[in-house]
Amino acid sequence: MTEIETMKDLSTCKDDWLKDAAKSADFTDDDTLLITIHRGAKQIGGSITEISMGRTAVLVDCGSELPGSQGSVRDEDIIKKIFCNRRRYTDHHLSGVLFTHYHGDHVGLMDRIPTDIPIYMDSATLTILRTLHKHTGNIAMQEMLSSGNERIRTFTPGKLLTIGDMNIIPFFVDHSAYHANMFLFESRITNHTVLHSGDFRSTGYMAKSLDIIPRLIHENYGKQVDVLLTEGTMMTRSTDAEHLLTEWDVKKEATNFMRDHRQIFVICSSTNFDSLTSFCNAARANKIPVYGNSYIIEMLKVFSDMAGKYTGLYGLPPIKGIDELKQARPKEGIVLLGSLLNRKNEDAYSLYDRYSHYMRDYKPHLIYSMWQGYLSPEHPAYDEGLATFVKRFGSSVKYIHSAGHADKAALAKFIEDVAPRKYIVPLHTKNAAGFKALPIEDKYKEMVILPDDGDRIGFR
């Protein structure tokens, strides 16, 4: 039996499946699976999902909103709802919070989680977050992530994790965050299963993982997925060629560009290891030295030490410090700048002037490798400081970027490969309804349900 209930007045709901929830249901029975979309049903970023099986409830991610977000639930309100007012609408105590990866829109509210609730992440994510927040000055995050904090617990992708009435299997998946994870949940009471996709894509160096995961679930573990919770970031974004570049394409384009332009700044997230690898190896192919500040150098060393153990793909050339750039004033060099988000205009100007004068001809080019929405004044996420910096280069800007999320074709293939049996619930998207128009079998289109933030989906 399936029932849906919501925190809002059900009489005003338009969807038939949601109106049916007006029938009273006992959502405290041990044989009931509950999924609560606290935030993410109608927005990108700030994702928080709750899964309850038996007497055990966990959150997946606890993220802050993205810059310029116009979501209906603010960070402060969501914290109060989940943690302060919790017992007003559920008897289930939270047994833990699991994090899919280290991006701020998935971990940004981690320091607001009550201290009696355990936190789970894989060891790579923990190492990266510790390195990141050593440089941010966020004391609360630094203390939470310290090695002496026993509430931080690590898991290993592919190995069973048991929390109360749940068995959980994490799966490594390709994303613009290194070592992102999907989670397969199984009730130890009813054997109901839920696959939470987290963020994923099919264009990175580890893209084969997207094909492997469904096979592992069905063949190695012998499981079928009842409910698929899947991201849909790209459902409202263009799918033209610039969004469909693979990391192999990024490396190829960068290699060709560097052949003709030997002094280049690169704007790319300092935690996007795949793309940083692409640019560093493109520079190596052209025998151009690579420079970065101490933060970039440390992050690349952390990434390379972890990933380099498994494949030579992530072996990087030596990265020189900015001081060496200043002293040498080279004729050629690739300078990794990070993302440059959230800077004031004057900071952007001074950074350009300082770094460009370290180059001999003072006419460097720029590779911009991030989402273009940050540069558009019409977009809520517009970053004036970043846009100011980019404008200084005029026509000497080259856009080379591989999207961090799955496009519609990849989403459709993933859904059919997973082959869920009951529901498909879109998350991390502004176009959940678009899932019904994906090129998937009709039976899967009929499984798509469109809850609002705060709705609870339950079945026995």
Spans of model-derived segments:
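His/Asp/Glu-rich metal-coordinating catalytic cores
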Residues: E3-G96, D105-D274, S278, A285
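Active-site microenvironment of metallo-dependent hydrolases
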Residues: H428-R460
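C-terminal structured "cap/appendage" subdomains that terminate the fold
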Residues: L411-A437
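Short gly/pro/ser/thr-enriched loop/turn and capping motifs at secondary-structure boundaries
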Residues: L66-P67, L126-L129, T203, I297-L300, ...
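Short acidic loop-to-helix transition motifs that present clustered carboxylates
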Residues: D105, F155-L161, S176, N272, ...
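Metal-dependent phosphodiesterase/nuclease catalytic metal-binding core
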Residues: E50-R55, L59, N181-P420, Y444
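Conserved G/P- and acidic residue-centered "switch" motifs that form tight phosphate/ATP-binding loops
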Residues: H101
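Short hydrophobic/aromatic-enriched beta-strand-loop microsegments
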Residues: P118-M121, M141-L145, K287-G292, K443-D453
